[in-house]
Amino acid sequence: HFDYTFPALLVIVLLFSGLLVSSTTIIEEKSSKAFFRNFITPTSNALFIVGNYLSNLLIVLSQIFIIFLALYIFSEAAVSPDILTNLSIIILLTASVFILLGMLIGYLFKSGETSNLAVMSLACILLFFSNTILPLETLPIAIRSIVAYNPFILAADALKEILLFKAPLAAISFQFYTLLIYIGVFIVLIYVVRLFSKRRYVE
């Protein structure tokens, strides 16, 4: 049953690595001696955000590449070229959501301890309210309608549709556009929080 569990395992890796790596990077940046020099430079906030995002994305995607490489070496399971593009898009969107969420947590908290505690708590909540641990059918209808927008569930469902049924993006449009909305919202929140913390730091 590895084909059915692999999408959830892949999202778990994206969840924890994306949240932990990005939040730790932001906390280390805030605690470094160069933090004040970055604030007084004429460089825009957007450039720092994009730089942090791309560096974290490179780390997370490297981990995913190693996972697929090990899967190919030990089981000789290869990804079909027909689904490679769609699979890459969903992985990229999922990694972006969790990385941006981790960056937001890093900007919201001051110390590494509180940031790591918030990251682990949020990751456990997202993992708990998913089909991986708790079947959604056991939840009340009201809670189930809210949990349906859990990015973990959206990503896992999209990956299952692509890996098992070779579904096109049109068949997973709900997951695709919802993940895009998450990315847009997190980018705006990160920019606002960084701008607010910059003004408070300067004052």
Which residue stretches match the model-derived regions?
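Transmembrane helix-boundary elements of multi-pass transport/secretion proteins
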Residues: 1-36, 40-65, 69-71, 75-84, ...
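Short hydrophobic, aromatic-rich alpha-helical segments embedded in or entering the lipid bilayer
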Residues: 134-177
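Transmembrane helix-loop junction
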Residues: 28, 71-72, 103, 107, ...
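Juxtamembrane/transmembrane-helix interface segments of polytopic membrane transporters
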Residues: 63, 67, 71, 106, ...
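Hydrophobic alpha-helical transmembrane segments of polytopic membrane proteins
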Residues: 86-112, 127-130, 181-189
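Transmembrane helix segments
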Residues: 109-149
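Transmembrane alpha-helical core positions of polytopic small-molecule transporters
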Residues: 12-17, 28, 60, 64, ...
